[in-house]
Amino acid sequence: MAEVTATVALTRADVVPSRKRVKLPAWLEVAKPRLIPLLLATTLGGMALTEGWPLSSPRLICTLGGGALASAAAGVLNCLWEQDLDGRMNRTSGRALPSGRLSPTTAFIGAIACTLVAAMLLVSGVNCLAAGLSLLGLCSYVLLYTALLKPRTTQNIVVGGVAGAIPPLVGAAAATGHIGLGGWWLFALVMVWTPAHFWALALLLREDYRAVGIPMLPVVKGPVVTARAISRYGWATVLLSGFGILALPTGGLFYGLMLLPYNNRLLQLVHRLAADPDSLTNAKSLFRWSILYLFGICLLLILSRSALAAHLDQQMIAMLMQLSVA
């Protein structure tokens, strides 16, 4: 327990360092720009899982631009909904809305503008399915997670995680006009990855959530139960990630081989946290790696669609066939 007390200040500074060290303009801060790159990475991952990869430059730009604006709008609306809650937590009281650096009216107008431009980009430059899915992601984040589930249940992120899992569907729809098996697989992977990722962060910030009555799992059930839940979802993530071998049109063997060290590190950190659930250092390490893990998965999906990966796949298949004959 001494470790917990000693590392609380360090953890808050390290996990969300930029909020303390780099002050973003108020209008940009409410858009939560640090969340957008990972959402766009999973969008690209969804594209790479289809026969439509690679996309033309205009379609790619419209998809990523529309997705970024839809994500920004969701971030602003989330900040608007939670401005009173943010004002009651030390960690968030300095944010643009509770501190008065940005008016709610200005923020709301900005959110509507981002939503409209995102919809226009996606409808005109991509297709209606991609546009509809982006708006579904926005609504599910603001209404399903933020407004309905977050203040009411410890399983808020399990169900509400659907919002963060929609970008792969957008990517698949942008590439082919339909979702397909690969898009649904990456959607499912992000869904099972999300609880382990978010609960690691919630372990670090549980006293903030406790102070304002948000029923996050670490607050209600404690670190031991949370670490067990993280372990279950961590294993589910590892097992499901392997199905990317089948979901990829080409390069599946390359993906499977390169995936091994990612999964090994994830399980190592999950087990370390399970062995010492009170360690904020362990929770912080898992939280950070979980972000790199999902970025890495998406990068592997893209690399697996390269000519080099396809060639390596053919070489490995030929080698396996020779071994089976011998």
Swiss-Prot record:
Among the GO biological process terms of this entry, one is:
heme O biosynthetic process
Q: Which InterPro entries match?
A: Protohaem_IX_farnesylTrfase (IPR006369), UbiA_prenyltransferase (IPR000537), UbiA_prenylTrfase_CS (IPR030470), UbiA_sf (IPR044878)
Annotated pathway:
Porphyrin-containing compound metabolism; heme O biosynthesis; heme O from protoheme: step 1/1
Q: Where are the transmembrane segments?
A: 35-55, 60-80, 106-126, 129-149, 157-177, 185-205, 238-258, 289-309
User: GO MF terms on file?
Assistant: protoheme IX farnesyltransferase activity
Protein's UniProt keywords contain Cell membrane = yes
Protein name from the UniProt record: Protoheme IX farnesyltransferase
From what organism does this protein derive?
Answer: Synechococcus sp. (strain CC9902)
